[in-house]
From Swiss-Prot:
InterPro entries reported in the protein's UniProt record: Aminotransferase_I/II_large, HisP_aminotrans, PyrdxlP-dep_Trfase, PyrdxlP-dep_Trfase_major, PyrdxlP-dep_Trfase_small
Protein name: Histidinol-phosphate aminotransferase, chloroplastic
EC number: 2.6.1.9
Subcellular location: Plastid, Chloroplast
Cofactor(s) this protein requires: pyridoxal 5'-phosphate
Similarity remark: Belongs to the class-II pyridoxal-phosphate-dependent aminotransferase family. Histidinol-phosphate aminotransferase subfamily.
Tissue: Expressed in flowers, leaves, stems and roots.
Gene3D superfamilies noted in UniProt: Aspartate Aminotransferase, domain 1 (3.90.1150.10), Type I PLP-dependent aspartate aminotransferase-like (Major domain) (3.40.640.10)
Organism domain of life: Eukaryota
Length: 413
């Protein structure tokens, strides 16, 4: 005899019984008394299908291609058989000078690394307000600008919504859109890498996308968006996310303050390039008050680590160092550009950033060039996308890095 007990709670306690004829007996607790059937029951293990872990994964993620990151020093060192200090790393736009000395001192003097960080990053946001001239209530910090890109999408996009992407550009926008179940409408850039504003306007009118991601200076070509172009796009009924990861090298003023007058503008910044803190992952953004309220609700509470906040605040205390490093990189960018123009199989593009995009010409294979340089200990970036087929990107390093690159390139002509 099997018994199914209905507990007097919101949950149901169920005991399994064979198919049966049932009667209900009333007592202090409701009981269903079941007479077991004499019909044989098929083994449960035979009825169940084998369940694998991927059955629990959201369907759209099953087809997601992983993001292709740059290999770290440790992996490169093993693969190339070289010490990290013997590798000329010009493939990830990192700041070769590193952070101000105050950063290392501050990290070594951290008193409470065992305590959770301030969920509002108050000290950092106050320092950023002083640095940018924008009040701290408009600023939100993150574990790198990448986290903020994902946070924006999680707050703005429903599955099936659309974003506008303007390739070639930073591929994280397309990747995060796919992770969040959104569709990407691509509006390719013009041959000179400028934005096709007319086509963007047409797409916004007919497809009704939620947001557009723009990078200025753009990665990977180093072009900038002028104020007139940006204002035209801001006039459209779409949320504009302006990524200014490289703005310090452009000579242009940041648009962070614009969020006070444009309700559809978000501006993202980072400490990775300017302050040499790529390994500590700390970025920030400027948001209209009507938007930032909801990002505060949705963000992870302890997203900026104690170490990241300490390092970023220490870096901001030495603006002279940051300025000197910026000037050094801009000067080296111009020198590198002129030297690359002398290479018969490279056609470099003018850049407002800390990298230079080059078209590989004269029958030279771009991927093989990248691989051959790697065997010599020099790393540059090669792309597989159709927009950048036949291109390589070279980060600006120190003068000695430029010399090492040029010495290796001369092996090919």
């Amino acid at each position: 005899m099997g018994v199914i007990e209905l507990c007097n709670t919101s949950s149901i306690c169920i005991g399994r019984a064979n198919p049966s004829c049932c009667s209900i007996e009333r007592n202090q607790r409701r009981r269903i008394i079941c007479m077991a059937s004499s019909v044989p029951v098929q083994e449960e293990s035979q009825q169940k299908q084998r369940v694998t872990g991927d059955a629990f994964i959201r369907p759209h993620l099953l087809k997601l291609s992983p993001y292709q990151p740059i290999l770290p020093f440790e992996v490169l060192s093993t693969r190339l058989g070289r010490k990290p200090e013997d590798i000329v790393k010009l493939d990830a736009n990192e700041n070769p000078y590193g952070p101000p000395p105050e950063v290392i001192e501050a990290l070594g003097a951290m008193k409470f690394p065992y305590i959770y960080p301030d969920p509002e990053s108050r000290t950092l946001r106050a320092a950023l307000a002083e640095d940018s001239g924008l009040e701290s209530e408009y600023i939100l910090a993150g574990c790198g600008a990448d986290e903020l890109i994902d946070l924006i999408m999680r707050c703005v996009l429903d599955p099936g919504d659309m974003i506008v992407d303007c390739p070639p550009t930073f591929t994280m926008y397309e990747f995060d859109a796919a992770v969040n179940g959104a569709h990407v409408i691509k509006v390719p850039r013009n041959p000179d890498f400028s934005l096709d504003v007319e086509r963007i306007a047409e797409v916004v009118e007919h497809e009704k996308p939620k947001c557009i991601f723009l990078t200025s200076p753009n990665n990977p070509d180093g072009s900038i968006i002028d104020d007139e172009t940006l204002l035209k796009i801001l006039d459209l009924p779409i949320l504009v996310i302006l990524d200014e990861a490289y703005v310090e090298f452009s000579g242009m003023e940041s648009k962070m303050k614009w969020v006070k007058k444009h309700e559809n503008l978000i501006v993202l910044r980072t400490f990775s390039k300017r302050a040499g803190l790529a390994g500590l992952r700390v970025g920030y953004g400027a948001f209209p008050k009507s938007i930032i309220e909801f990002l505060w609700r949705a963000k992870q509470p302890y997203n900026v680590s104690v170490a990241a906040e300490v390092a970023a605040c220490a870096a901001l205390k030495n603006p002279a160092y940051l300025e000197n490093v910026k000037v050094a990189l801009v000067q080296e960018r111009e020198r590198l550009f002129n030297l690359l123009k002398e290479v018969p199989f490279l056609d470099p593009y003018p850049s407002y950033s800390n990298f230079i995009l080059c078209k590989v010409t004269s029958g030279m294979d771009a991927k093989k060039l990248k691989e051959d340089l790697a065997t010599m200990g020099v790393m540059i970036r090669h792309y597989n996308s159709k927009e950048l087929k036949g291109y390589v990107r070279v980060s600006v390093g120190k003068p000695e890095h430029t010399e090492a690159l040029m010495k290796c390139l001369k092996h090919f002509y």
